[in-house]
């Protein structure tokens, strides 16, 4: 088996119950692996099935999983898939992963990389990656031999955001445009609630909602845009997103992955987190000066949001300072650094010897 050219297997799911965040983390990482000419294969349970087109569009292969990650029978199916592909590494991403699951994968001789943004389990694998700013090293439990890649240097940023980083080196003139990006797991429909509030603010001329077509309330957002045509739009395509990123003056986010991608571009942000992991991330962004943390989304009132928006839009130096801090915080090279960490392990003499002995069909 040639370790240098072996493919990478991704075990992740994307469903309404478990969310799609970990799935898109894997897609971003797969794009970085392909830049190193690594084959990428997804073994995933997807809902809706149209997500398979997203996988294929990124030049990845996909095999449907019959069960959810961590459910009975999934471990055996994942091992069979890894042996069929002669995979050199398995990337596992999901909240239902247990230490025993990762330990059994490691016993096969495959390198195990796990995405974990919650630090909820003790990790026995080779690599643990947290693409968020928090939690930090002290929160994680891991066994001897496990390497951790945590923090801002390993934030995953899609190519569309990296390409706009240089173009948006200077802010565009008014009127002011706002971006609303609460991610795909916006089950409380904060995107619509906050967009309605932004439309009531005289300083905001237009609002662009960044989301995907499988957003839990996508059809409601479409109806809302139809009523407010001219001032509100939904942006789902990459080509449309490129122009909106350059023109945006302020963004409302929940502190998730898209918030860090907007930091790479340099757009000032107001964060209203909806999840504990996002809460820690949003607070760190505020500490670094890249965003203003307003509090949990359920607690922020219209008056608080209105005051925060006015402060940012009325002061160009405030926007400039936030933009510079954000660009210094996230440089867009996190995916490549994670690939480097994985390649170092794959090329180590200890791993190559174990892989030859253990990974048998």
Model-derived segments and spans:
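Conserved donor-binding/catalytic loop of nucleotide-activated donor transferases
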Residues: 246-249, 263-270, 288
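A short, well-ordered alpha-helix in the C-terminal region of glycosyltransferases
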Residues: 311, 318-332
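Acidic donor-binding loop of glycosyltransferase active sites
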Residues: 246-258
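Donor-nucleotide binding loops and adjacent catalytic segments primarily
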Residues: 166, 172-248
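A nucleotide-sugar donor-handling region in carbohydrate enzymes
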Residues: 124-189, 217-219
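Active-site and donor-binding regions of nucleotide-sugar-utilizing enzymes
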Residues: 10-20, 25-34, 38, 45-144, ...
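C-terminal alpha-helical cap of glycosyltransferases
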Residues: 331-361
């Amino acid at each position: 088996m040639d370790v240098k050219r072996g493919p990478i297997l991704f075990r992740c799911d994307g469903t309404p119950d478990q969310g799609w965040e970990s799935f898109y983390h894997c897609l971003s990482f797969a794009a970085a692996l392909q830049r190193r000419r690594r084959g990428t294969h997804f073994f995933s349970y997807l809902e809706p099935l149209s997500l398979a087109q997203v996988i294929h569009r990124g030049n990845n292969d996909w095999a449907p999983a019959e069960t959810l990650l961590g459910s009975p029978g999934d471990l055996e199916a994942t091992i069979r898939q890894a042996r069929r592909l002669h995979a050199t590494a398995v990337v596992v991403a999901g909240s239902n992963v247990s230490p025993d699951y990762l330990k059994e994968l490691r016993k096969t001789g495959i390198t195990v990389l796990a995405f974990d943004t919650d630090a909820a389990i003790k990790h026995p694998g080779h690599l643990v990656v947290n693409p968020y700013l928090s939690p930090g090293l002290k929160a994680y439990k891991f066994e001897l031999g496990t390497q951790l890649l945590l923090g801002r240097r390993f934030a995953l940023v899609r190519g569309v955001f990296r390409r706009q980083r240089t173009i948006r080196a200077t802010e565009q003139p008014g009127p002011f445009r706002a971006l609303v990006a609460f991610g795909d797991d916006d089950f409380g429909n904060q995107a619509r609630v906050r967009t309605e509030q932004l439309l009531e603010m005289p300083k905001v001329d237009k609002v662009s909602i960044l989301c995907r077509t499988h957003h839990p309330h996508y059809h409601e957002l479409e109806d809302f845009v139809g009523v407010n045509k001219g001032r509100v739009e939904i942006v789902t395509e990459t080509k449309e997103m490129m122009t909106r990123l350059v023109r945006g003056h302020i963004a409302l986010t929940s502190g998730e992955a898209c918030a860090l991608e907007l930091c790479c571009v340099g757009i000032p942000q107001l964060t209203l987190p909806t999840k504990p992991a996002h809460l820690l991330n949003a607070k760190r962004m505020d500490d670094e000066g890249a965003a203003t943390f307003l509090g949990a989304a359920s607690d922020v009132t219209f008056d608080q949001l209105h005051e925060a928006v006015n402060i940012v839009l009325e002061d160009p130096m405030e926007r400039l300072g936030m933009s510079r801090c954000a660009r210094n915080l996230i440089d867009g090279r996190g995916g490549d650094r994670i690939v480097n960490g994985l390649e170092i392990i794959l090329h180590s003499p200890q791993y190559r010897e174990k892989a030859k002995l253990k990974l048998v069909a």
